């Protein structure tokens, strides 16, 4: 199918997936999501859709606002990273070209808002991690501050994302 990067479609698909998993005979009705980097970005969007059977999330190192955290830096355009992501993706059909979408939407508008999770909708317990030297830091901190769960934890660390994710102590 077509690939719409980092938008509400991810959240809606994830909602359906959570509810499908919860109905399986081997599931106790409780589901959770862990995600790092791009997968974390999807986790934010799924949790914002509030699937009834999502019991908690572990959101590690995930950008929330593509416009301010990835495509621009203090208002200065830098679409190269997103262009690299699109180039690296293997997709049989159409894939959204975020770097070039910046040319069509140079300001934070409805298009970019559709790619930002509605943080305030996230009410499940959340364990959020952010690396102090990584561009996902802002998404981790903003997400932690804005989600409405009374049970949320933020862990900031000094390392990059991948070694911490695959450390056996964290599995």
What are these regions (language model features)?
Residues 1-171:
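Active-site-proximal cap/loop segments of hydrolase catalytic domains
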């Amino acid at each position: 199918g077509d690939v719409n990067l980092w938008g509400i479609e991810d959240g809606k698909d994830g909602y359906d997936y959570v509810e499908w998993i919860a109905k399986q005979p081997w599931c106790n009705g409780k589901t959770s999501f862990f995600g790092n980097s791009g997968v974390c970005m999807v986790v934010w969007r799924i949790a914002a859709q509030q699937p009834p059977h999502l019991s908690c999330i572990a959101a590690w190192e995930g950008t929330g606002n593509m416009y301010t955290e990835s495509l621009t830096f203090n208002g200065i355009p830098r679409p190269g990273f997103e262009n690299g992501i699109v180039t690296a993706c293997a997709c049989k059909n159409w894939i959204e070209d975020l770097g070039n979408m910046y040319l069509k939407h140079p300001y934070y508008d409805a298009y970019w808002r559709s790619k930002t999770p509605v943080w305030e909708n996230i009410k499940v317990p959340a364990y959020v991690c952010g690396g102090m030297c990584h561009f996902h830091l802002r998404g981790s901190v903003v997400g932690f501050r804005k989600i409405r769960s009374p049970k949320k934890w933020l862990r900031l660390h000094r390392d990059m994302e991948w070694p911490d994710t695959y450390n056996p102590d964290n599995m």
